[in-house]
Structures are given as structure tokens and as C-alpha cells.
């Protein structure tokens, strides 16, 4: 009898657990089709499942996401009027309590499980996809390549200077030993044994890059891409997925981009413009400065201050020298933080924020009236912002591209 009772109790427990699992599945696992109403007009029907960012992209609505949907950039904002569940802790570092009450969400964090009613920025309806062809992919510095893409014939990417595109990469495996690196840069690659790395990616990825080209350079998109190698203190960490993929591209390869996106745009004023950059932060600096001078024929006073380690890390030198010769309202300066003996450098040395202060802003009659545009490594951005705050520059005159470096 006890054996029979035990079997019955065991069976009951199994049935209860099975029912609990089925109930949980009905609540947690997405099934069937759902409808998403966009901006009170467009209705999208799609299978439930996945994140809202990807679901919208599949329907041709591309929400900007500099981090590729990782939840770290905070740019893929939409307003969820109904559906979507509760806001997640990962979103609250980017969304204020007031914004959360108004329905603001990060689309990369919203699960597509039920019918939803959402609002997206109107400008995203102007975003498109293009399959581009690699024209060239050349080293401009030890760890920076210039990727030049040809837009399909008859097409145009209607971007503004300072804007960015998103680039897609399929699943891939990339070995650093196969990279085409000019010999002049081998010293550092050998020193840090960078040839050892392999980047293996098992699913499609998406990342954002600021454009180095400006709107009048028709038919092409230019990017400056820094290779994201593991930090020396954590050599076993995986290398950057997208930068590794981009560095492997060769002329003739096909690449899918979407855009344009952006908010790092120049103000339409007569104020002096001070551009401060470093590393791959060169990209939006070049785009802005060329646009102001070559397309707009701006008469504003424009200075450009760029920080690099050594002469080997300087690029677009001839381009900016030519601009300075052609436009009397433009000057540019480079500061090397660690010049090599063979550089025979007699220019500015040190960190760029100190050089800008000592040689331009220290005795400037009204630095608070200038507009400052910057893009570079995080520590450079932080140092420049502190220096500007100490000078009394208001936030509205400090414009930062914080993912282009």
C-alpha cells in the first residue's frame, strides 16, 4: 500500500510541476503573431519573440543603436504606450524616472511578447539599408584603418557632417595573422603579439561608426576604424568583434550599412569653432571641418587640435595642411604625447587638453563663447570637458561624439 501511495504522490507532484511549467511557458515564452502599432498609423504584424529593436529592423524601421543592441549606449529610445512589460533595471541608467513614467524605453531591452503601441522618432523613416562595396581598407596609423565604401550606383546616403552609419557583420572567424599590415607598423604589433588573436562570432552583429567623409564626397562612405585589441592587463579577453571583421575586409567585399543617424551636428551660428580630437575620433572632425570649409565656405574662425602618440599616428596631414593654406580662417595643430627620437619633432608635446589650454584658451578673451566639438578616447574627452568647465564653458557649447573614438 505504501508503495502504491508513493507512486500516486510522485505522479501528482510530476503533474503539478508539468502544469506549472506550462503556465510559466504561457506567460514567458512568446508564441503566435502579434501586432505593433507605430506612431498611431502603421501596423506591423510579426511573430512574437526577440527584442523590439530587431523586430523593427526586420520591418525596415532602423532605430539608431551605437552599441548594436547591447544596452550600453542608450540611443535606441522609443515610447511604449502599451505592451512591452515593465522597464528593466538595465534601462534606468539611461532613462530618468520622469521619462520612464512617460513610457520611454530602450528598444533593445523590450521583449516582443504581446501587441504593442509605440512611438518612434519621425526621422527614422528616412533611414535605409545599402549593400556597399569595399574600395580600399588601408592603415592610416598603427591601429587605425580607413575603410572606404562605394555606395550602389544611383543611390545616395543623405547624411550630415558629424553623422554616423551602422554596419552589419555576418557570423565569421577572423585571424589577426591574416591582416594586411604595412611593415612600418609591425613594431607595435610584434611588441604586443597582436598576431595571436582570433575573433570568432557566431551570430550577426551591428555597430555604429562616425563618418570621416563629408556630404560633398559623393558616392562614398569613409570610416576610421580602430582595432579593439584586448587590453594589456587582460590579454586573454576576446578582441573587438566588429573592428576585427572590418580590418579583415578587402577591396571588392560586400558590406551592408544602414543610416544615416546622428546628433553630433554643427550649430548654425557665427561662433568660433574649436575641434579637439584623438585616435579614431579623427573621423567626425574631418567630416565637420571639410563640410564647414569646402561645402559651406564658412567664415567662422576654426581651429583643430589633434592628439597622437608619435608621428606614426598622424594622418590626413596633407589634407589639413591644404585646408590651412586655402582658408585663412582655419588653423590646425598636433600634439604628440610620446614622440619617438626619429620623429625629430619640434611641435607641441603633451596631452592635448593641456596644449589647447596653454596655447589657445589660457589667454582667450572669451572661451565661454566658443563652440567645442570633440571626439577621442574616453580619458581625453573627460580631461577636455573638465578643462572647459573650469573655464566657465556651458554644457550647450560642449558637443561630444562619445562613441567615435
From Swiss-Prot:
Q: Which Gene3D superfamilies match?
A: 3.10.20.30, Nucleotide-binding domain of ferredoxin-NADP reductase (FNR) module, Translation factors
Q: Which cofactor does it need?
A: [2Fe-2S] cluster; FAD
Provide the cofactor note recorded for this chain's UniProt entry. Answer: Binds 1 [2Fe-2S] cluster.
Tell me the superkingdom of the source.
Bacteria
- The ranges of region (Catalytic) come to 270-387
Annotated membrane topology:
Single-pass membrane protein
Q: Report domain 2Fe-2S ferredoxin-type positions.
A: 32-124
- First-listed, main subcellular location of the protein, grouped into a coarse class: membrane
Please describe the quaternary structure of this protein: Composed of six subunits; NqrA, NqrB, NqrC, NqrD, NqrE and NqrF.
**Which family, according to the similarity comment?**
Belongs to the NqrF family.
What name does this protein carry? Na(+)-translocating NADH-quinone reductase subunit F
Natural source organism: Neisseria meningitidis serogroup B (strain ATCC BAA-335 / MC58)
Q: What is the lineage of its organism?
A: Bacteria, Pseudomonadati, Pseudomonadota, Betaproteobacteria, Neisseriales
Amino acid at each position: 500500500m505504501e508503495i502504491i501511495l508513493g507512486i500516486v504522490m510522485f505522479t501528482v507532484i510530476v503533474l503539478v510541476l508539468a502544469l506549472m511549467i506550462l503556465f510559466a511557458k504561457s506567460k514567458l515564452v512568446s508564441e503566435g503573431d502579434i501586432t505593433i502599432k507605430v506612431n498611431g498609423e502603421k501596423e506591423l504584424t510579426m511573430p512574437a519573440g526577440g527584442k523590439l529593436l530587431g523586430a523593427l529592423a526586420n520591418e525596415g524601421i532602423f532605430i539608431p543603436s551605437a552599441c548594436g543592441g547591447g544596452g550600453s549606449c542608450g540611443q535606441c529610445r522609443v515610447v511604449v504606450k502599451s505592451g512591452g512589460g515593465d522597464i528593466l533595471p538595465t534601462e534606468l541608467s539611461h532613462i530618468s524616472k520622469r521619462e520612464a513614467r512617460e513610457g520611454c524605453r530602450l528598444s533593445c531591452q523590450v521583449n516582443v511578447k504581446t501587441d504593442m503601441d509605440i512611438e518612434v522618432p519621425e526621422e527614422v523613416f528616412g533611414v535605409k539599408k545599402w549593400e556597399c562595396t569595399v574600395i580600399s581598407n588601408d592603415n592610416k596609423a598603427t591601429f587605425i584603418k580607413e575603410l572606404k565604401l562605394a555606395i550602389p550606383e544611383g543611390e545616395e546616403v543623405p547624411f550630415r557632417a558629424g553623422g554616423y552609419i551602422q554596419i552589419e557583420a555576418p557570423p565569421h572567424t577572423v585571424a589577426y595573422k591574416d591582416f594586411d599590415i604595412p611593415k612600418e607598423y609591425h613594431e607595435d604589433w610584434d611588441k604586443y603579439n597582436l598576431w595571436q588573436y582570433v575573433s570568432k562570432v557566431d551570430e550577426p552583429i551591428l555597430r555604429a561608426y562616425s563618418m570621416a567623409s563629408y556630404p560633398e564626397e559623393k558616392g562614398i562612405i569613409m570610416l576610421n576604424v580602430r582595432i579593439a585589441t584586448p587590453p594589456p592587463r587582460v590579454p586573454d579577453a576576446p578582441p573587438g568583434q566588429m573592428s576585427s571583421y572590418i580590418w579583415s575586409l578587402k577591396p571588392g567585399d560586400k558590406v551592408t550599412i544602414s543610416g544615416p543617424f546622428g546628433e553630433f551636428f554643427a550649430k548654425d551660428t557665427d561662433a568660433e569653432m574649436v575641434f579637439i580630437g584623438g585616435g579614431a575620433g579623427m573621423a567626425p572632425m574631418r567630416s565637420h571641418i571639410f563640410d564647414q570649409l569646402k561645402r559651406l565656405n564658412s567664415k567662422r574662425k576654426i581651429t583643430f587640435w589633434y592628439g597622437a602618440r608619435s608621428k606614426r599616428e598622424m594622418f590626413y596631414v596633407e589634407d589639413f595642411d591644404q585646408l590651412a593654406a586655402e582658408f585663412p580662417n582655419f588653423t590646425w595643430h598636433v600634439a604628440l604625447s610620446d614622440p619617438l627620437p626619429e620623429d625629430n619633432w619640434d611641435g607641441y608635446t603633451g596631452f592635448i587638453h593641456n596644449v589647447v589650454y596653454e596655447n589657445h584658451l589660457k589667454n582667450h578673451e572669451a572661451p565661454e563663447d566658443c563652440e567645442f566639438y570633440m571626439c577621442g578616447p574616453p580619458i581625453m574627452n573627460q580631461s577636455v570637458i573638465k578643462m572647459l568647465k573650469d573655464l566657465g564653458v556651458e554644457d550647450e557649447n560642449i558637443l561630444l561624439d562619445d562613441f567615435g573614438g
